[in-house]
Swiss-Prot record:
Acts as a negative regulator of innate and adaptive immunity by maintaining immune homeostasis. Plays a regulatory role in the Toll-like signaling pathway by determining the strength of LPS-induced signaling and gene expression. Inhibits TCR-mediated T-cell activation and negatively regulate T-cell function to prevent hyperresponsiveness. Also inhibits autolysosome formation via negatively modulating MTOR activation by interacting with RAC1 and promoting the disassociation of the RAC1-MTOR complex. It comes from the Eukaryota. The gene is TNFAIP8L2. The keyword Ubl conjugation applies. It is found in: Cytoplasm; Nucleus; Lysosome. This is Tumor necrosis factor alpha-induced protein 8-like protein 2. InterPro entries: TNFAIP8-like, TNFAIP8_sf.
Length: 184
């Protein structure tokens, strides 16, 4: 027989409730204005690249669900010492990816899709390892979906191409602000 834990039960209920409500209103509870603006631009890029509104909505919804669930796990103190160390390494890798994306956006002729895709793949693998024992396989698939979508070399090449200059500029502005404020 499993021991009863009201904290565990409350956490399960919170995650279940949040998974049903991962829309704009809930996102604003966990995601600030700058992050929201970056997510909106990522949605526009995905929509233009895939020519599919539902596909773009799905990837951003999955991203929000994952971000909210990881935030809930972190705030609830569910991560042990080794997981917190992994979370710190994940954050550093994410920051490295953001700085690389900024560098590619600011310095002409430096963009390499393989470098950015590699960083995103490393982030995906670290996040999957971090939440392995805390989230369901469905959430693991969401993580794969989000990172695989944004690490697609075709999408990255399009993002750094002439047709997406405006979107890239807004994404870079948001990433720079998030890095400066320590929110990434």
């Amino acid at each position: 027989m499993e021991p009863f834990s009201s904290k565990s039960l409350a956490l399960q209920a919170e995650k279940k409730l949040l998974s049903k409500m991962a829309g704009r209103s809930v996102a604003h509870l966990f995601i600030d204005e700058t992050s929201s603006a970056v997510l909106d631009e990522l949605y526009r890029v995905s929509k233009e690249y895939t020519h599919s509104r539902p596909q773009a909505q799905r990837v951003i919804k999955d991203l929000i669900k994952v971000a909210v669930k990881v935030a809930v796990l972190h705030r609830s103190g569910c991560f042990g010492p080794s997981e917190l160390a992994l979370a710190a390494r994940f954050r550093q890798k994410l920051q490295q990816g953001a700085m690389t994306a900024l560098s590619f956006g600011e310095v002409d002729f430096t963009f390499e899709a393989a470098v950015l895709a590699g960083l995103l793949t490393e982030c995906r693998d670290m996040l999957l390892e971090l939440v392995e024992h805390h989230l369901t396989p469905k959430s693991h698939n969401r993580i794969r979906h989000v990172f695989d979508h944004f690490s697609d070399p075709g999408l990255l090449t399009a993002l750094y191409g002439p047709d997406f200059t405006q979107h890239l500029g807004k994404i870079c502005d948001g990433l720079r602000k998030m890095l400066d404020e320590g929110k990434l």
